[in-house]
Amino acid sequence: MKMIVGLGNIGRQYAQTRHNVGFMIVDELASKLNVTFQTSKFEAQVATAFQDGEKILLVKPATYMNDSGRAVGPLMSYYNVDPADLLVIHDDLDLPLGKVRLKQKGSAGGHNGIKSIISHVGDQHFKRVKVGIDHPQKMSVVDYVLGKFTPAEVAKFDDAKITALAAVEAWLANDDFTAVMNQYN
């Protein structure tokens, strides 16, 4: 079983914001897999898909971004998901807008949603798809990440979304994340 988590903030006011790229990409993946999200008892929306006989859980925590681990940890325990089978999709301020970077494991790198997952899972050996949103030039980080993409930024994000989805689909198809990293990084 694999678990793919998209990070974001719940609520209409956060839809289509830079901080919600994880939600947007997981929504697109659910659409491609023809599954819909249901509210679970674990403070998350969960969609279940099957590919080549393997169960795939798509997850959108219903906590706020900085508390994502509160949903992810219990879900992993309940479904007995190994950290090696967890992939988290999230925004990254340190990558240029539209750049996608895959990572096998590691620290939170300043991302509070990832920090929360590491804390609740008790392990940092899980996969990530980091989507660059760039760093704000003249505004606060909070205002920037909670802001919507400008019309000029949308095309770059759309390209990143295509790349991120292709990378996730490649991992689901062949389970060799190192090869996927070599192809997409």
UniProtKB/Swiss-Prot annotation:
The record marks D91 as: Stabilizes the basic form of H active site to accept a proton. The active site is at H19 (proton acceptor). Keywords: Cytoplasm, Hydrolase, RNA-binding, tRNA-binding. InterPro entries: Pept_tRNA_hydro (IPR001328), Pept_tRNA_hydro_CS (IPR018171), Pept_tRNA_hydro_sf (IPR036416). TRNA binds at Y14, Y64, N66, N112. One of its GO terms (cellular component) is cytoplasm. Its EC number is 3.1.1.29. Monomer. PANTHER family: PEPTIDYL-TRNA HYDROLASE. This is Peptidyl-tRNA hydrolase. The lineage of its organism: Bacteria, Bacillati, Bacillota, Bacilli, Lactobacillales. The gene is pth.
